[in-house]
């Protein structure tokens, strides 16, 4: 059965339309709609007798709500917080105080949390203060969400409302994941530490190095803030790339003239995020295990570092390592056609599809028709799924066969084809 999840900003009109569509499907005898009816409203044995109120109840329960009215309250509460309408929030909460403790989006796995945390995500300070006065207890989670979203004023407000509590349970992991420089700086200003008695906070590093966000300059700055607060990063070429430190890469190249021909294992890419390195072919897009610094730069959208490498002798057609089953050998061009950055381009058209990295490689002579075989599997956060194999594909073939098109750049595909690329 469909498992429905309210979006971060739900739309009541859309839910009304969904209920009417569900009712029509039930009356038409649609198998999925009938199965939903039986699962969520087994007492109604005659589908032809279903009314709109019945379809609304089925829909509400499929969203995890106990009733249609509970679903409506959730949407109205979310909408009021988005509009910064404190009066409506107060009315809804006082009419049903249980809402103060329940997730606004109903589902237990919603990381936007109860009303105070939900408001903290949006920097709605007046609403945060009011909900605290009404008895909200999710201060730590709300503070974490404010930091993650870079709402520094809200973070400080929650810290003061809580009576300046111990910082032991505050973490830098949230703003590390979203690459929020402001949130990281605010937590450091409060006294949160990146170093623990046993070394750097591994959870924070896993969130920073393994994030699916793409904002190289922000990641560089956050890593330098960690250094300013006691972190001593490993002196490796990949860490220099993570930090955006071309000066350190220059030093590594001087010591190792073969640097640009070397390939790196996934554990080299995520040295302080061991959980990210456990499965070599699991990736956010094109796998990064066994690849060169140019592939790694493409994986993290480090265009300026790639320009420097190409200016200093990097072969634009440098290949990934080939394993004992013949998988590998792909170039960085594959890594630009299918990438995490493309997800953010395609997801609600969030960023322009400039395909800068693809254009850079092609302008520097990358072969658009190199063939390679790849094995790839999605991270759990992107839905997981089976390990898939792609044999003897070109960059265009890789993009066409990749199952999740949100990770495929249409502009990259167009550019590759314009440079003579074939399937």
Where are these regions (language model features)?
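Ankyrin repeat domain, specifically the short helix-to-loop turn at the C-terminus of the second helix
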Residues: 93-100, 129-137, 156-165, 185-194, ...
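Intrinsically disordered, low-complexity eukaryotic regions enriched in glycine, serine
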Residues: 1-91, 95-96, 107, 118, ...
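Terminal, low-structured helical/coil segments at or just beyond the last alpha-helical repeat
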Residues: 398-423
């Amino acid at each position: 059965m469909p498992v429905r999840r309210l979006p971060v900003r739900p739309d009541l009109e859309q839910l009304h339309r969904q209920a009417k569509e569900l009712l029509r499907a039930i009356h038409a005898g649609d198998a999925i709609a009938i199965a939903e009816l039986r699962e969520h409203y087994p007492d109604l044995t005659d589908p032809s007798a279903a009314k709109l109120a019945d379809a609304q109840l089925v829909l509400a329960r499929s969203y995890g709500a106990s009733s249609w009215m509970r679903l409506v309250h959730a949407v109205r509460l979310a909408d009021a917080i988005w509009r910064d309408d404190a009066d409506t929030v107060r009315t809804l909460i006082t009419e049903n105080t249980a809402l103060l403790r329940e997730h606004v989006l109903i589902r237990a796995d919603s990381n936007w949390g109860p009303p105070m945390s939900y408001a903290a995500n949006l920097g709605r300070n007046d609403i945060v203060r009011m909900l605290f006065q009404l008895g909200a207890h999710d201060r730590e989670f709300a503070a974490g969400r404010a930091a993650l979203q870079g709402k520094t004023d809200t973070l400080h407000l929650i810290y003061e409302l809580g009576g300046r509590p111990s910082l032991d349970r505050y973490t830098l992991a949230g703003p590390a994941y979203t690459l929020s420089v402001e949130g990281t700086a605010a937590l450091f200003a409060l006294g949160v530490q990146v170093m623990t008695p046993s070394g750097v906070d591994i959870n924070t590093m896993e969130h920073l190095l393994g994030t699916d966000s793409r904002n190289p300059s922000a990641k560089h700055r956050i890593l330098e803030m960690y250094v300013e607060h006691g972190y001593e990063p490993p002196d490796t070429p990949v860490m220099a790339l993570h930090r955006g430190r071309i000066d350190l890469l220059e030093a590594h190249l001087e010591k190792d003239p073969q640097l640009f021909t070397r390939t790196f294992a996934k554990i080299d890419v995520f040295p302080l995020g061991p959980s990210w390195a456990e499965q070599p072919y699991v990736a956010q897009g094109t796998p990064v295990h066994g690849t060169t610094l140019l592939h790694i730069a493409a994986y993290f959208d480090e265009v300026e570092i790639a320009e420097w490498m190409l200016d200093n002798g990097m072969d634009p057609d440098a290949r990934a390592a080939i394993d004992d089953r013949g998988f590998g050998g792909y170039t960085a061009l594959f890594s630009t056609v299918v990438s995490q950055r493309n997800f953010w381009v395609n997801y609600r058209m969030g960023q322009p599809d400039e395909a800068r990295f693809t254009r850079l490689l092609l302008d520097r002579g990358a072969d658009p028709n190199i063939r390679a075989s790849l094995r790839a599997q999605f991270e759990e956060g992107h839905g997981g799924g089976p390990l898939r194999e792609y044999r003897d594909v070109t960059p265009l073939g890789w993009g066409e066969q990749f199952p999740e098109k949100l990770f495929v750049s249409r502009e990259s595909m167009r550019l590759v084809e314009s440079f003579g690329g074939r399937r």
